[in-house]
């Protein structure tokens, strides 16, 4: 969600962005556990504004911070995985933790297998369907966990170790073909230290 309000001076406005792993649904709000980020960081707010302009056909898709499905999400995910593979190859301990509702996309599953074969330590927290096969020779460094709790785990949070300087993302897409290639869904990095420590 994007909002903008005046600051008393007709020429001054403050814009805000809210990016969540779920939506505002009164029926599921009492059952689902989600995360949301409410921010006025310009790089995130500007990207979200550009996304809405793109959906209206008024802007070319240019995103510097957000990862947006059908635009820059897949290339950036591949870059993040490649980084962890490179670190593992150098003996610096590649690390990936992914929390999501479903893992089904064959291309991304193959990337996780590849990372595992290079020694990247991977933890998957998948609530629903998981097409990745753990405990095989090609997935020996991958652990799959499911959380059973009072509320339905709905958050999508991705952690990439980045040699001790973690890159953490949250957003709406699961790793399914419909989410990664057909829908337009947004993922934001967690840039401030307090939310980083909370999600970590």
Where are these regions (language model features)?
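Short beta-strand or tight-loop elements
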Residues: 140, 151-155
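Structured core elements
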Residues: 9, 16-20, 66-68, 80, ...
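Polar, glycine-rich mid-to-C-terminal structural blocks
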Residues: 13-20, 27-30, 43-47, 54, ...
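Short acidic (Asp/Glu) and glycine-rich catalytic loops that position anionic groups and cofactors
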Residues: 25-33, 55-64, 89-93, 137-138, ...
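Primarily the HKD phosphodiesterase
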Residues: 80-143
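Short, glycine-/Ser/Thr-/acidic-enriched flexible segments
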Residues: 9, 16, 22-26, 37, ...
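Single conserved hydrophobic/aromatic residue that forms the stacking wall/gate
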Residues: 1-11, 200
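Long, C-terminal catalytic modules of enzymes
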Residues: 42-43, 50-83, 166-198
